Amino acid sequence: MIDATPSHAVLREFFDNSSLTWGLMACGVAQLLKLFLELLVHRRWRPAVLIETGGMPSSHSALVTGTAACVGWTLGFDHPLFALAAMVAFVVMYDASGIRRAAGLTAERVNGLPESLWPDAPEKPLKESLGHSRLQVLVGSLMGPAVALPGLEFVGSPLHLLSGLGAGLG
């Protein structure tokens, strides 16, 4: 059956998706924490960490666990969509700490090969910071619900927030 919902209503629903919004907020907070840690630990201002992969904490883990927590909180933790969101979260976190990390370690070794073994090596070395340690994934996975659930419970949906600020979208 074809849905006759007007496109503006679909856009409104999309932008008012609390699970999506708060999952993305958790991801953003994790990325900002990377910048803060760069300043605190390495004593340097390097905004590039905001768009790089790897590092503490895992923003992908924060994204998927924050989203899954919102889905569970909204629909119930026995709902099939929560099960799906949780399984996707586990796959993403396994990938970050397993496969992507292994690829980064391999790149590190390849970059360390002597020039005599690899005479046609690219001028730019392979990217080594691809994945996360288990601790980085754990911290990200705890940050997700810690950011998303209070946002969902106390602030609500994005359009609800904007209408409360006087934007007239409610």
For each predicted feature, which ranges?
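Membrane-embedded catalytic cores of phosphoryl/pyrophosphoryl-handling enzymes
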Residues: 28, 32, 47-170
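A glycine-rich beta-to-alpha transition motif near the start of alpha/beta enzyme domains, typified by
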Residues: 37-46
